[in-house]
Amino acid sequence: MDQFSTLTEQEFTTFAMTHPAGNFLETPEMKHLLERRGWHCEYVGVKREGQLIAACILSKKKVKIGYAFDIDGGILMDYTDKKCIEAFFTGLKKYVKKNDGLYLTFTPNKQICLRDFNGGEVEKVNQETFDYFTSIGFEHQGFDVHNFDGAPRWLFVKDMAGLTEEDLWKSYGKDAKYDIKKTWEYGVTTRELRYEELPLFKKLTEETSARRNFEDKDLAYYQAVYEEFGERAKFMVAELNFATYLENLHEKLRKLQETLNEVNEALIANPKSR
């Protein structure tokens, strides 16, 4: 019989690290991060004859007259196993109600529509799972690409497995190739920031959020991510190397001057070709 229950951190970690749908949102590090941000979190899941077959992080936060519950990036389970799904959500509903839950938001790590490079619809997938969620009371919040208050609803994923550098270059569109060539020309380099440089990262995200109209996190959040995830979290910046940029400009000027000299020499030798 499938049984919904709370889990230990060791049970969850062992299961999540080997699950094909595992992701950073469903890790002990994320649970600890959420708790530092004021959420209370539990590991919950479903066991079948003592064997764990589904798991996720269930978070809750106090609101005016109860608690708001949230699952982000889960549930780690086989969505084709109907008995498991039913056991999970039946148990989850009881758990949320027992713990004064006002509402539950759920962002599954599950595709609903595949799209091409330009955003055009290719194929709808997992419709049966989607229909099941709505049948038990969930309301879909739509596919707004501009405003979101949590996990983004649209993701761009590029499979680079087995690609050589040449293959990868050929896969880029014309605009992408142009932009990359410009970064080479300008001497743009990337590097990983140290913990003490996170205020610089915060300054960049703050300016970008104001320009692009999205809500930024505070510095304490980025510091907590760095502390909890350690080497698994990468804070990267792109920087313009002015010395390299100037050198490239001088080289471009030199080549242009060579071309100009060749043209002038040709005109002197053949004045009537003007």
Range-by-range predicted roles:
Residues 4-65, 116, 136-149, 155, ...:
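A conserved beta-strand-loop-helix scaffold within acyl/acetyltransferase catalytic domains
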Residues 66-148, 256-258, 263, 268-274:
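Acyl-donor binding region in acyl/amide transferases
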